Amino acid sequence: MVADRFENLFICPSDFNASRRFYVDVLGWQIISEWTDNHGKKGVTLNGGAVRVVLAESPEDATIQNPNAPHAATLHLDIHDADKRFAQIPAGEHIVQSPHDNERGARSFVLRDPDGNLIAFDEMRQRS
């Protein structure tokens, strides 16, 4: 059996510095590594606990990127206390939904990064 494992979420932001500030200053994620390529394009790998996010101005796979594609995915993070985690988030336009009980039985809230990517923080009440 093949056991694929989630490695990271890759984001090619329209404003690298704004996205870096969002993930570091708003979410409080730790920087694992930062780099600048031979053309001066920046990148950073961030640790959000169980998920890594890579932000890069010029990805190696840029030829398959579609910057005009509509929003198609939301990153869902499994957290232990939605209200406590939300209290750590500074106020701002990045808040899409405050903590609420959703139809899946989770307590969740949703943020939007500077490029419009959604990040849902889910406290699952019923664990399987």
Identify what each model region corresponds to.
Residues S19-V24, I89, D113-G116:
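Conserved active-site tyrosine of GNAT-family acetyltransferases
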Residues M1-N8, Q30-L77, F86-R112, E123-S128:
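Vicinal oxygen chelate
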Residues L118-F121:
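Short glycine-/small-residue motifs
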Residues N17-A18, K84:
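Alpha-helical macromolecular-interaction surfaces
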Residues P13-F16, N38-H39:
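Conserved beta-strand-loop-alpha-helix junction that forms the acyl-donor binding cleft
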